[in-house]
């Protein structure tokens, strides 16, 4: 399995992102040295794509496949792309507060901690649908790891499109998110322009 191993703060600095979007409380003490440099139109489009890939932990080939799928769906391609990325199971676990970061959520899914509608899911790219019930397996709920995670991440604000029961470590997808409910600082229209060339 290919994983991006670039240091988080270094990558956040280069993309102009706040580490809090990824679930990190760290802050960079360095100044942006290239902040005043003029960026071309292609450079802006590429940066937006890299931001989205980095935030959601998706590599180039799956990201391109998500774009193709979003392009074939009805509606706006950019909005469809963001909805697909938000509905990945690793992102949903992060949003529900069952993981501190998306990387940790991915690992929790990989290690078979998660069930969707009563069935174990161990594929981080699994896409949830409206009405799906996501739960941490009974055998994993009382582990020290899950207790530590819930203690730290449990206070996170859950988006409107999700419903969570923190006691049972269970969440429900009420509906797929709209663009207003997605708080990721990405301009998806620039990504659409990049791929439509």
From Swiss-Prot:
Signal peptide annotation: none
Domain of life: Bacteria
Pfam family, one: S4
Coiled coil (residue ranges): none
GO terms of biological process kind: ribosomal small subunit biogenesis; translation
The S4 RNA-binding domain, residue ranges: 87-147
GO CC terms in record: small ribosomal subunit
NCBIfam families in UniProt: PRK05327.1, rpsD_bact
Record function comment: One of the primary rRNA binding proteins, it binds directly to 16S rRNA where it nucleates assembly of the body of the 30S subunit.
PANTHER family assigned: 30S 40S RIBOSOMAL PROTEIN, SMALL RIBOSOMAL SUBUNIT PROTEIN US4M
UniProt subunit comment: Part of the 30S ribosomal subunit. Contacts protein S5. The interaction surface between S4 and S5 is involved in control of translational fidelity.
Protein name as annotated: Small ribosomal subunit protein uS4
Species: Agathobacter rectalis (strain ATCC 33656 / DSM 3377 / JCM 17463 / KCTC 5835 / VPI 0990)
